[in-house]
Amino acid sequence: MNRLLKLTAIIEAAAGLALMVVPAVVVRLLPGSRLDTSAAVTLGRVAGAALCALGLACWLARDDGQSRAARGLVAAMLLYNVATVAVLAFAGIGFGLHGMALWPAVILHAAMAVWCIACLRRSPQNEMNWFDHKTRGPPSTGFDAH
């Protein structure tokens, strides 16, 4: 899971920075169209900031391994990757858009979604089981009153 989080952090932060700095170039590469209004440029930059935030979250979780927080982040990234595949594929098939990077981006996000699923299917390692089956309750903290 660590490698997935590191690679996701790099990819999404780079895409986010590109959208914030040169949104027209990114839009030209993906759907192959132009950003004609200031509102579209603004929304592109907001999307870039969101991708940077995802990248930062993945980078900060990269050494958490199988923690619940890291697994939750990977589940969120799975949703993001599946939605991105659907939106970009529909842009290509349904709207006939054809930017140079459109289909490579679809393939990349599909592969990342498969990797997310593989990581989530693995049983968590070194994760404390929250429910103690011996006492049928939460694990003891050592500070419980006797």
Predicted features and spans:
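Cytosolic juxtamembrane helix and N-cap/initiation of the first transmembrane helix
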Residues: 1-12
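Core segments of alpha-helical transmembrane spans in multipass integral membrane proteins
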Residues: 13-20, 39-62, 75-86, 107
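Interfacial loop at the N-terminal end of multi-pass membrane proteins
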Residues: 23-44, 63-66, 131-133
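Non-cytosolic membrane-interface motifs at loop->transmembrane helix junctions
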Residues: 33-41, 71-73, 96-107
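Juxtamembrane helix-break-helix junctions at the cytosolic face
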Residues: 58-71, 92-94
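Membrane-helix boundary connector in multi-pass membrane proteins
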Residues: 86-104, 119-121
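Membrane-water interface at the C-terminal end of transmembrane alpha helices
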Residues: 111-130
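Short, highly charged, low-complexity non-transmembrane loops/tails of multi-pass membrane proteins
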Residues: 126-146
